[in-house]
Amino acid sequence: MFLNKCEGDLGELRKPGDSEGTPPAAAEEEQPKKKHRRNRTTFTTYQLHELERAFEKSHYPDVYSREELAMKVNLPEVRVQVWFQNRRAKWRRQEKMEASSMKLHDTPMLSFNRPPMTANVGPMSNSLPLDPWLTSPISSATPVHSIPGFMGAPQALQPPYGGHSFLNTPPGMAQGMQPMAPAPYQCGTPFVDKYPLEDVDQRSSSIASLRMKAKEHIQTIDKTWQPI
């Protein structure tokens, strides 16, 4: 009976948490902690406009300016302070991006940032004379007989002018094929043999006979003038 009484007293003294063997404080610690959720403020268009105007005036407003602005836009001063912190961080990021883009643009090694060079080959080629050693000595469009100092062949060796094809071409093409300037040293009318070989022989024999007659006449005159 004594044992039964002791067991009954012990059962009354026990608690529900002790039956499990773990204290209630440890059981609460084992439960996962809930993360603190931040309340995001949704700004109206009017509030954003006033905040941006204040940021343009000063990036670091003091407490009095923030309180005055908070009363104006109907927001807590803490929310206004957080907005200015976020706005300054955004402004710094923009400044860094602009500085990096300017450095890339000013780098001389990057050729793709340079403006393309315009080639003015046409006006330069028209204004500057060409090197005479690089040009051909005689242009194919210039006729040979128009070159100064050229001695033309006799007309007997040249084909008649009626046989040239450029005389039968249209006037527009014929003007383009004419020489650029008249030749200053063209030979005159070529020698044409008007007398055949027989006439030349007769003339030479007649000249010789005339010379003989002249000598005989001089000799007769000398004889007549000799003293008697």
Curated annotation (Swiss-Prot):
Lineage: Eukaryota, Metazoa, Chordata, Craniata, Vertebrata
Designated name of the protein: Retinal homeobox protein Rx1
InterPro entries (alphabetical): HD, Homeobox_CS, Homeodomain-like_sf, OAR_dom, RAX/RAX2
Family as reported in the entry's similarity comment: Belongs to the paired homeobox family. Bicoid subfamily.
Gene Ontology terms, MF aspect: DNA-binding transcription factor activity, RNA polymerase II-specific; RNA polymerase II cis-regulatory region sequence-specific DNA binding
Function (record text): Plays a critical role in eye formation by regulating the initial specification of retinal cells and/or their subsequent proliferation.
SMART domains found in the cross-reference section: HOX
Position of sequence motif Nuclear localization signal: 211-215
GO CC, alphabetical: nucleus
One GO process term, biological-process aspect: regulation of transcription by RNA polymerase II
UniProt feature coiled coil, ranges: none
Primary residence: nucleus
DNA-binding region ranges: 36-95
Motif (OAR): 205-218
Bias (Basic and acidic residues) ranges: 1-18
Compartments it resides in: Nucleus
Positions of the UniProt region annotated as Disordered: 1-41
Pfam families named in the record: Homeodomain, OAR
Keywords, comma-separated and alphabetical: Developmental protein, DNA-binding, Homeobox, Nucleus, Transcription, Transcription regulation
PANTHER family per UniProt: HOMEOBOX PROTEIN, PUTATIVE-RELATED, RETINA AND ANTERIOR NEURAL FOLD HOMEOBOX PROTEIN 2
